[in-house]
């Protein structure tokens, strides 16, 4: 690489960034098209048992891995699970925690807010969906000498990565559910994850069942979420 192909900035090499550029009319079409794809995304709980190729799932994880992160630490691990024995273990443990949540931990207001979703402590989708993605946040890392190294904005970083993951799932023609049984420590034990990794999100992924229904709920209008300053 010749000298003109990079610059040294504050002692570190920086390479040129040449993003794809489009005419403005194409940009408008692409932005609207992406929005139309994204607005079709729904959380589902009725999955088809139709297999999903592992190759697709790997590319979805690759997409999540392109997310920005604090100090570029990339503080995440994504576990892909299709093994039926492991999925059953996860379901049993999740339902034990969810039973306690629905019967003892959740407030009346919380339970009332959940009523339109039609949910309860039973989580059959954990076994029905062909794949589970379990996202772990890495609260610290270890260097090659076994010393702890800091990670920064870990929750924000993995949240961004999971958002990109959900859009990638929808873009591929698949559906997903964001599931957060609380507490989730059982995921660390079942998947044998190290002490520096904490479970963040359990995402069943697959094709929507032909008879899938979703709640008749609506997203906020643009005026409720966007303020423009010109």
PLM features: residue spans?
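Glycine/small-residue-rich phosphate/adenosyl-binding loop
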Residues: 4-7, 80-158
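C-terminal helix-cap and adjacent tail motif
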Residues: 2-26, 201-230
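Short loop-to-beta-strand entry elements in the cores of soluble alpha/beta enzymes
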Residues: 71-82
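Glycine-rich, charged/polar anion/phosphate-binding loops
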Residues: 63-65, 116-121, 187-189, 212
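A glycine-rich helix N-cap at a beta->alpha junction
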Residues: 98-106, 192-215
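N-terminal accessory segments that position/regulate proteins before the catalytic core
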Residues: 1-44, 48-58, 89-92, 103-104
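Glycine-rich phosphate/pyrophosphate-binding beta-alpha loops
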Residues: 65-71
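Small-aliphatic-rich amphipathic alpha-helix that forms the alpha element of a beta-alpha
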Residues: 41, 59-65, 133, 139-190
């Amino acid at each position: 690489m010749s000298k003109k192909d990079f610059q040294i900035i504050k002692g570190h090499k920086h390479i040129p960034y040449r993003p794809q550029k489009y005419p403005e009319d194409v940009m408008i079409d692409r932005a609207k098209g992406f929005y139309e794809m994204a607005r079709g995304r729904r959380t589902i709980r009725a999955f088809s048992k139709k297999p999903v190729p592992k190759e697709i799932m790997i590319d979805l994880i690759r997409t999540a891995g392109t997310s920005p992160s604090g100090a570029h630490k990339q503080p995440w691990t994504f576990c892909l699970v299709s093994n039926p024995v492991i999925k059953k273990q996860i379901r049993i443990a999740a339902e034990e925690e969810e039973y306690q949540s629905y019967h003892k931990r959740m407030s009346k207001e919380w339970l009332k807010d959940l009523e339109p979703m039609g949910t309860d402590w039973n989580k059959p989708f954990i076994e029905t969906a062909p794949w589970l993605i379990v996202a772990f946040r890495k609260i610290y890392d270890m260097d090659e000498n076994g010393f702890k190294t800091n990670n920064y904005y870990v929750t924000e970083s993995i949240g961004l990565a999971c958002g990109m993951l959900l859009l990638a799932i929808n873009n591929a023609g698949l559906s997903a559910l964001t599931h957060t049984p609380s507490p989730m420590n059982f995921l660390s034990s079942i998947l044998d994850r190290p002490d520096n990794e904490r479970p963040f999100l359990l995402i069943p992924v697959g094709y929507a069942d032909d008879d899938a229904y979703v709640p008749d709920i609506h997203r906020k209008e643009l005026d409720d979420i966007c303020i423009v300053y010109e």
